[in-house]
């Protein structure tokens, strides 16, 4: 089993993985967010210098994690593809090959803002397309989180309080926390943001960037350093 930190979300045992994913063992389901396949190729086509091989290494990490967990379902919480330019043989060919070799794997994608611009993946890939608020057990699957401080949705409206609403799993923010040491030195680490009503996952992709956040009261951050997780909370 892939090492990580075991916690309860909505009274459900899950494991937070330093590989930037959440594992739900009872349902053999792996959650990731913000994969952004094809981002490097998109930037390169615009003449922007980018690291070579980012899409390949991201896909390799994702498939290796699926295999290590023996996942039956892979849920991507938005932004699988970065832009329409990602609909190329160079990007989709390796993805199609990996999925073809794993016919029993169910792959679900919650449409994110980049997916809206890129367009849905080809039907031949067999990826199930989901809209925001899709319910999976005790969880609601979203791309955008609610406002972490005020419990509001990304457009500024009050977050709905429904008696049947589940614990929201979301991405989009690419959250990272800055840890400061001596002599004003610091390091920025990707992190999970966990509170009573939602969990925000860090970006899975290798070439995605990150947004520095500050922990808000009542929230736990799980920072990722290499293959280790560190908890930052009120305790």
Question: What do these predicted regions represent?
Answer:
Residues 1-77, 82-235:
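Extended recognition/assembly regions associated with phosphoester-bond processing machinery
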């Amino acid at each position: 089993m892939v090492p990580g930190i075991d916690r309860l979300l909505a009274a459900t045992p899950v494991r937070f993985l330093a590989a930037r994913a959440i594992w739900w063992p009872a349902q053999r389901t792996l959650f990731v967010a913000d994969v952004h396949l094809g981002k490097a190729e998109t930037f390169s086509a615009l003449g922007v210098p980018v690291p070579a091989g980012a899409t390949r290494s991201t896909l390799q990490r994702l498939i290796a994690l699926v295999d290590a967990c023996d996942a039956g379902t892979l849920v991507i919480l938005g932004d699988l593809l970065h832009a329409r330019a990602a609909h190329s043989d160079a990007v989709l060919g390796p993805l199609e090959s990996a999925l073809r070799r794993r016919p029993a794997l169910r792959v679900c994608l919650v449409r994110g803002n980049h997916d809206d611009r890129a367009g849905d993946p080809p039907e031949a890939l067999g990826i199930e397309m989901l809209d925001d608020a899709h319910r999976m057990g005790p969880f609601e699957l979203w791309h955008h989180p609610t406002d972490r401080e005020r419990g509001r949705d990304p457009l500024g409206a009050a977050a709905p309080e429904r008696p049947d609403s589940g614990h929201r799993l979301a991405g989009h923010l690419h959250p990272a926390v800055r840890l400061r040491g001596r002599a004003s030195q610091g390091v920025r680490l990707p992190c999970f943001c966990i509170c009573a009503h939602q969990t925000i996952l860090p970006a899975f992709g290798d070439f995605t960037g990150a947004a520095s956040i500050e922990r808000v009261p009542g929230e736990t951050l799980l920072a990722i350093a290499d293959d280790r997780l560190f908890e930052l909370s009120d305790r």
